[in-house]
Every structure is written in C-alpha cells, then in structure tokens.
Amino acid sequence: MIPRAVRLCFLVSAFVSLVSAAGLTVQGVNRAEFWAFFDSVYATHTEDKMDMDLRYGDLNGTLGLFMYEPSRPWVGLQQPMRLFDYTVAYSPKQLEILYGKFFQTFGKGLALRTYSDDDFRHYKSMNGCRGTAHLPLSTEVVALAGRLRDVFFQENTYQVLNRTDTTDQVMGADLSTQPLEWFGFGGRYVRVNGQNDPAPKAFTEFVGGNMSAAYGPVDVYGELCQRLGTKPGIGGRDKGLGYYLSGTAAVSGYSLLAEYMDYDTLGYPAAGYHYNDPPTPIKSGVAIDRGVDEKGFGVTATATPTNPLYLEADYGRLYRHKDNLTGVVEWEGKSRFSPGTDLTFEAKFNHMVQQNIELHVAGRGTNKPTLQANYLLGQSTIALEAEYDFVTEDTGRMVVPWKYHEPAVSLSYGYGAALLFTVGWQGVDMKLDRRYNGEQSWPMFETVWSITERNVLRVRIGAERGGYTCSGGVCRFESPFKGVKAQLISRF
C-alpha cells in the first residue's frame, strides 16, 4: 500500500512536468481562510480550497484540494476534513469521456442535481465516470455512473451530509434535443442503488422528460418526473411525482416570468441530503422540504420605463398539499434610479411569512425596507446601505407573539480598484437567547485589499448577527460570530 503522502508527491511531480510541456494551459483559484473566535477558548478555524483546470489538446483535467482544520478540542461533528479530487477527461469536439469528480444536473433538477456554491459553502458532487456526446440537431446525450458526496457548512463546521450513504451507486442517462428552432424536448433516467435497501431489487428510480417551445417573445417550459422507490423497512412500491412549468415573455424594456411547481414525494431521500433539488419559487431560497411535499408558484416582473429607472416585483408562495399550517409567502418590490453615471439609488421592500419552516418556530413574519446609495467621485467610491426589519415571531407556545426589530447599517469607502473599507453595525432591540445567544449588538470593520489583479485579501474584525439563511432550497442557521476573519483569494 503506497502512503498517501507518497502518492501526493508523485502527482505534484507529474503536474510540474506537465506544466513545462508546450501547449499546456493551467488556470485556477485558491481560497484560504482563517477565523479566530473571541470566545473563552479562543478557537480557530483554518480552511483552504484550491481548484485547478488543465488543458492539453483534447485532454482536460482538474485538481481539487480542500482542507478544513478546526482547533482542538474537536467536539461532536466538528472534525478536521481533508479532500483530494481530480478529473481526467478526453474531450474532442463531439465527445467527452470523463473520470473523477464532476457536477451534473438533469433538466431543472427534478431527477438529479449537483453543484458547487462557494458563497453558501455547499459542494454536492459526483465521483465516477461520465460520457457526453454532441450530435446533430442540437442533441446531447449524457450517461453517468458514480457516487454522491454532499459537503455542507453548518453549525460552524463542515460535514458530509450523506456520510452514512457514500457507497450508494448512482447511474443515469439524459437526452436533450432541439430538432426545430422553436421546439425542443428531452428525457432522463436515474437509478440509485442504496447500501441500506432491504433487498437487491429494492432501488430508487427517477424517470422524466421535458418540453420547451418559443414563439416570438414568449418561451414556455415544462418538466415531469416520477420517482419509483421502495418503502423503507417494510418493502413495497413507494411512488412520487413532480412537475415544473414556467413561461417567460420579454419585450423591449419589460419582462415577465411565471412558474408553477408541484412535488409529491419526489425529493429523495426524504430528509438530510437529496439526490435531486427541484426549483423553489421563493426568491430568498427558502423551501419546505426540497421536493418531498411542496406545491407553489412564483411571478417576477421587471420594467425599465426610462433609461435611468429600473423596477422589479417578485411574488412567491410555497405550501404543502394537505397541511395549511406549513408554508412560506414572500414578495418584494425593488426600484433602482441612476440619474447619472456617478450616482445610483436603490430602494426595496421585502415581506415574508414563514410557518413551521424554522426549527422551534411556528411562525415568523418580516417586513424589511432597504435603502442603498452609491456615489463615484474621481477615484473614490462611497456606498451606504441601511435596513430596518420589523419581525413578528411565534414559537407556538406563546399567548402574544414577540415583536422586535433588526436594524443594520454599513458605510463603505473605496479608493481606486485596490482598497475598500467598510464599517457596519447590526442589532436587535430584544434579547433572544435561542436565536442570538442573548446578544443585541454586532459592530464590524472590514478591509478589502486588491494586492494585485489576481490576489485579493479581505480582513473582517468584529461581530456578525447570523440567523436563518437559505440558498436554492437548502437552509441553515448561522450562529452569531465574534472575532476575526481573514480571506485570501488568488487566481492563476
């Protein structure tokens, strides 16, 4: 058995040799972070993530390194993590054969969706092999086989959400074609063989298809997916169905998007992580259970009646099929006015009501106005942002719900493209032990220094309020933070 360090040295040596070869192009990005907590033990958090792409003729490759190191003592789920990923692909014009780590989404994600989200620190990837063929009539065929790995940052630590199911096998195929300029369709099949399935014939399948059409300024899209699984423990067929419909219309200066979705026992597995992540109509990214039992719709309208004025309105609603006590409604109006090239004003108002979405919260309503202003003066940039959130919260065991306010303000000054300074403050006018550990004020100071065009250093000192945050239907609760965060992003 060759030690891991020896294998890594061999790979690095091989990479150095390849770099010297003519015709090889290399590019990538490295993000290094260090957190220091102002707590009783002065805990620290070190993280580094590097992604490198290599290309030599028809050969492609990627190299990914991830390191997470929390300071001791390691308690519960807080453990260090080391990940090493690679991809090797042969990619002529009409064909690609890939082995290693990859991301793949079929359609809108009703059958399969994987992705990488650095801002939300969520990395859901496949590891295996994939073949892609590009055929006439704008036709693409994808076949894959591999295993899922879902890495997510929550409770101030990285976790592999599917750590008990990393050996489950995923196989799938997808066909998409557009035989006519105005019409296209597709079909897909995904099969998951789980280690914990009660019998060899007990597996989960996703079978679906989609159609799209365009006429003038109008585009319509529809996707249907059926899940065929096995009831856990007792066996027997477990079926689910979901569909997604959308339509867009756009003319000069105006656009309208409408979408409708219905997911009934489609999300799999039912809790924790999912192989599929269907769209949510909620702009802020909130979902109930990511396709297990959801139904909703959303509408977005934009307008530019005059050149300096931009208007946008969004409305989304999501609820369960037979449960009136669970759901979310969100609407937002936004306007942006730029009287000149140096000055921009933006105002928006967001309203959201959540019922039984957050843990231990029966209902939470927010009304949040926000104002932003940006002014360019020579080489200087001045930006001001202020918001004031009116919150009503009910834990389900209260005679009178809580009513409190969450203000926030920040002022930024930038000089040229090299330096940006920001001072900010967040607060709450009520002591909330469960949500904010009884804290009520979070000041901070941040400096962003563009050392070169390819290297950016960001240092933040102070505190962050945290709270419930979502992206693409995946949500987490971020605890308040006090300390120092330093981040260096390097591109090469």
For each of these PLM feature ranges, what is it?
Residues 1-10:
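Bacterial N-terminal signal peptides that target proteins for export
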Residues 114-117, 474:
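Short glycine-enriched, charge-decorated loop/helix-capping segments at active-site entrances
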Residues 110-112, 155-156, 197-198, 269-270:
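Short acidic, glycine/serine/threonine-rich loops at helix termini
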Residues 21-114, 121-146, 152, 159-162, ...:
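Beta-barrel outer-membrane channel/assembly domains of diderm bacteria
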Residues 45-47, 200-204, 219-492:
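Exposed, low-structure sequence patches enriched in small/polar residues
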Residues 9-17:
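Bacterial N-terminal signal peptides
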Residues 119, 187-207, 212:
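Outer-membrane beta-barrel transmembrane domain signature of Gram-negative proteins
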Residues 119, 162-166, 198-199, 235:
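Alpha-helix capping and helix-loop boundary segments enriched in small/acidic/polar residues
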